């Protein structure tokens, strides 16, 4: 499943070059992932209460074009891989006209509250976490 979340670039996210600072894209990606999890009815609060966390372990970002103040951006997120302990999201940040600003591959894993890798508890596996095979 793909999910798209929309946001508008705010002034404090722009740097001295008047475009969105590259570090801000990490926040946009996090926003997109959380909106994706809400959309697939993933029980994020429940998994935390059960003593498990989903940690981002690696992000590759490919910057394609600049975004500027008041640009409306769409953050599209989809599950690309899912294993027993970890998974990968593919994310794209684009302007409303389709111009891609950034693409990212985000690897995450499930860990216990002690920080040890763990299988994703079955009760938290939702269909939306499964990659589309189309």
Predicted regions and their residues:
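Terminal targeting signals and extreme-terminal segments of soluble enzymes
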Residues: 1-74, 80-134
């Amino acid at each position: 499943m793909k999910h798209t979340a929309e946001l508008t670039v705010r002034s404090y996210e722009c740097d001295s070059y008047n475009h969105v600072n590259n570090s801000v894209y990490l926040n946009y990606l996090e926003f997109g992932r959380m909106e994706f999890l809400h959309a697939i009815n993933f029980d994020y609060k429940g998994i935390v209460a059960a003593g498990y966390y989903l940690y981002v372990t690696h992000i590759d970002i490919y910057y394609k074009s600049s975004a500027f103040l008041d640009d409306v951006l769409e953050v599209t997120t989809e599950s690309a891989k899912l294993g027993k302990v970890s998974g990968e999201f593919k994310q794209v940040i684009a302007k409303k006209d389709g111009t891609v600003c950034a693409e990212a591959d985000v690897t995450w894993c499930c860990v216990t509250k002690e920080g040890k890798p763990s299988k994703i508890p079955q009760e938290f596996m939702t269909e939306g976490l499964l990659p589309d095979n189309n």
